[in-house]
From Swiss-Prot:
Protein source organism: Lodderomyces elongisporus (strain ATCC 11503 / CBS 2605 / JCM 1781 / NBRC 1676 / NRRL YB-4239) (Yeast)
Gene Ontology terms: biological process: CENP-A eviction from euchromatin; nuclear-transcribed mRNA catabolic process, non-stop decay; regulation of transcription by RNA polymerase II; silent mating-type cassette heterochromatin formation; transcription elongation by RNA polymerase II
Source organism phylogeny: Eukaryota, Fungi, Dikarya, Ascomycota, Saccharomycotina
Family: Belongs to the histone H2A family.
Main location: nucleus
Quaternary structure and partners: The nucleosome is a histone octamer containing two molecules each of H2A, H2B, H3 and H4 assembled in one H3-H4 heterotetramer and two H2A-H2B heterodimers. The octamer wraps approximately 147 bp of DNA. H2A or its variant H2A.Z forms a heterodimer with H2B. H2A.Z associates with the VPS72/SWC2 subunit of the SWR1 chromatin remodeling complex. Also interacts with RBP1/DNA-directed RNA polymerase II largest subunit.
Name of the protein in its database record: Histone H2A.Z
Pfam hit, one: Histone
Keywords, in A-Z order: Acetylation, Chromosome, DNA-binding, Nucleosome core, Nucleus
Acetylation is among the record's keywords: yes
Length: 133
């Protein structure tokens, strides 16, 4: 054997159709970057734990869904106030207005303000005073 056999590798035949690479996000039908989420998962994993590609896809899908949900509610809040730009105040109103999102997101939103709320006990006293007069 002289070692002058077929050489594997290289570009291949020019007549073959070149395959264009598709991202993990495009294959999964997501907008958020699956590769970046996988990289963050690997970086945060303790003891060099292996991270499967399906775990990264699933986490990316969950993050995308939650973001879409919050943005939809914040957009509705902005539309109710007749403005075209979503501000932290709209995010605060959207998150605190939804019970499940309020339980999930406990963080303080900068420049979010507070929710308008009057205690029922205070309302009852005002109504009683008005009815006596």
């Amino acid at each position: 054997m002289s070692g002058k056999g077929k050489v594997h590798g290289g570009k291949g035949k020019s007549s073959e159709i070149a395959k264009s690479s598709t991202s993990h996000s495009a294959r999964a039908g997501l907008q958020f970057p699956v590769g970046r989420v996988k990289r963050y998962l690997k970086k945060q994993a303790q003891n060099k734990i292996r991270v499967g590609s399906k775990a990264a896809i699933y986490l990316t899908a969950v993050l995308e869904y939650l973001t879409a949900e919050v943005l939809e509610l914040a957009g509705n809040a902005a539309k109710d106030l007749k403005v075209k730009r979503i501000t932290p105040r709209h995010l605060q109103l959207a998150i605190r207005g939804d019970e499940e999102l309020d339980n999930l997101i406990k963080a303080t939103i900068a420049y979010g303000g507070v929710l308008p709320h009057i205690n029922k006990a205070l309302l009852l006293k005002v109504e009683k005073k008005k009815s006596h007069k």
